């Protein structure tokens, strides 16, 4: 059999990232969120934390009355990265990480009620969160990978 014609067909598939509906932030609580970017999220006080299967755990410190959200990125969003003195523009981070332009607007971010970015799923965590618990950390963000 000749190898000619063996590679004539190309199949492309496009999958939704799970865009947050509209521009309204979705509040994260102790219950699991819907799936965004292949993961689901929950935020709870450290005292209520139980290890979840197939999950990344991010510890951080925030006021006890804080609220947390998942939303699409907004113009001017900045994230403080580990090892940096100044926050980096999220738009620049997405360029540096080679995120395709059509995906950038719908990429979810995890924020506090003061619009501080904690995590850009699949890209980078903020310097405010750590996978190791530190003194004073009173909140836990759990990122569970969706098993399809």
What are these regions (language model features)?
Residues 1-148:
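AMP-forming adenylation/ATP pyrophosphatase catalytic core
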